[in-house]
Amino acid sequence: VDGVEILPDQMMHGTPHPSEETLAEWDRLCRGYGIKPVIADVFLNTNLYDNRTLTKKECVSLLIEEIKLAHRLGMNMIRLVSMTPAFVLEPLLPYCEKYDMKMALEIHAGLSFDKQKTKDYIAEMKRLHSPYIGLVIDTGIFCKREPRVMENYCRALGTGEEPIAVVQKLYEQGGDGRSIYGEDGAFIPALAAVLKSGADHMYAHFADGYENEPLSVLDDLMPYIFHIHFKLFEMTENGEYSVDYQEILKYLHDHDYDGYVATEYEGNRWTIPGQPMAEKEQVIAHQKYIRDCLKEIQG
């Protein structure tokens, strides 16, 4: 592993103003493991209060503090959580320049290119055309099939085979989890007819969190792509079960991408109750697979 990506809100007590003791421990860990701090994943809790959303000034002020913290941690990039409003970009540019900090919105399955706030961000990104404003691509938008670990988790909680079969067929036909909805926003008849229990409905609402976009959606965005999350649901002997990383790495190589790709393991959330979690084994296998693919592609 060459670098590390962290979520300070979850992993560093007191964020965005951790104690000196916490910062000293961070410095010690970085020195001890010899790993480069790469990117901080930051959130913007616009719904922090019950009775109102944050003002534009409050949003910008919070992100300024996140930029300062990421700089202190030795990073030069922050990931903006999906749906971050585009209005924060221009006011933050002077701070990005001061701290040499890139900002990159995460394009995440379920919140990707078809969402208006994502479209607004991309439009503002292109308007400003700054080397400090870009994107993080989450490869959950490139699922060739639904994660099997999610299906098995739902089965363990009582989901029947019929709803799962409907969604699997959608993928076979070139669709994805979003295809379970009709134009009216309701479940398509084929799925609605087989939802017979609470566990079936639970599965259906999980199913829309994965997309099956073509890699060509990135063609005109490559100059703005700063970082990529290589989503990991389940490693098999032949690679990741849902995502074709050989194909993705070849695409990135052919388009001269030179940023990091980061293993992001999410199979742990689908661990069946009573079964051991295999996060270390899964991440190690994924990292090895990525390196093997790169050796083959790069020669």
Report each predicted region and the residues it spans:
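Catalytic domains of carbohydrate-active enzymes, especially glycoside hydrolases
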Residues: V1-Q10, L69-N76
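Hydrophobic faces of well-ordered beta-strands that scaffold small-molecule active sites
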Residues: V4-I6, P37-V42, I78-L80, M103-L105, ...
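Glycine-rich, proline-tolerant flexible connector loops at the mouths of alpha/beta enzymes
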Residues: E5-L29
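Active-site beta-loop-alpha junctions enriched in small/polar residues
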Residues: L7-D9, V42-N45, M83, H108-S112, ...
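Charged helix-capping and loop-helix junction motifs
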Residues: P18-E25, K56-I64, A86-L93, K117-I122, ...
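Active-site acidic/histidine proton-transfer and metal-coordination neighborhood
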Residues: L29-G32, K36, T46-E183
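Gly/Pro-rich active-site loop or hairpin
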Residues: D114, K144-D258, I272-E281
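C-terminal helical cap(s) of enzyme catalytic domains, especially alpha/beta-barrels
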Residues: G274-Q298
